[in-house]
């Protein structure tokens, strides 16, 4: 079973596509800057760590209005 679960992650963001985009961008940022918001993570991989940050409510996403 995956932790965090997809159900708990979907409560934080509006779609699976947004979830993938936000977690991939954050994972790339962690690789470059070597920083993470959670001290002790379950996952050893960057994407897993990013998903844990999203589940903890440490990352958010705002849609930009394009007019």
Swiss-Prot record:
<keyword id="KW-0808">Transferase</keyword>
<keyword id="KW-0240">DNA-directed RNA polymerase</keyword>
<keyword id="KW-0548">Nucleotidyltransferase</keyword>
<comment type="subunit">
    <text>RNAP is composed of a core of 2 alpha, a beta and a beta' subunit. The core is associated with a delta subunit, and at least one of epsilon or omega. When a sigma factor is associated with the core the holoenzyme is formed, which can initiate transcription.</text>
</comment>
<dbReference type="GO" id="GO:0006352">
    <property type="term" value="P:DNA-templated transcription initiation"/>
</dbReference>
<dbReference type="InterPro" id="IPR006110">
    <property type="entry name" value="Pol_omega/Rpo6/RPB6"/>
</dbReference>
<protein>
    <recommendedName>
        <fullName>DNA-directed RNA polymerase subunit omega</fullName>
        <ecNumber>2.7.7.6</ecNumber>
    </recommendedName>
</protein>
<dbReference type="GO" id="GO:0003677">
    <property type="term" value="F:DNA binding"/>
</dbReference>
<comment type="similarity">
    <text>Belongs to the RNA polymerase subunit omega family.</text>
</comment>
<dbReference type="Pfam" id="PF01192">
    <property type="entry name" value="RNA_pol_Rpb6"/>
</dbReference>
<dbReference type="GO" id="GO:0003899">
    <property type="term" value="F:DNA-directed RNA polymerase activity"/>
</dbReference>
<dbReference type="InterPro" id="IPR003716">
    <property type="entry name" value="DNA-dir_RNA_pol_omega"/>
</dbReference>
<dbReference type="GO" id="GO:0001000">
    <property type="term" value="F:bacterial-type RNA polymerase core enzyme binding"/>
</dbReference>
<dbReference type="InterPro" id="IPR036161">
    <property type="entry name" value="RPB6/omega-like_sf"/>
</dbReference>
<comment type="function">
    <text>Promotes RNA polymerase assembly. Latches the N- and C-terminal regions of the beta' subunit thereby facilitating its interaction with the beta and alpha subunits. In vitro reconstitution experiments this subunit is dispensible.</text>
</comment>
<keyword id="KW-0804">Transcription</keyword>
<dbReference type="GO" id="GO:0000345">
    <property type="term" value="C:cytosolic DNA-directed RNA polymerase complex"/>
</dbReference>
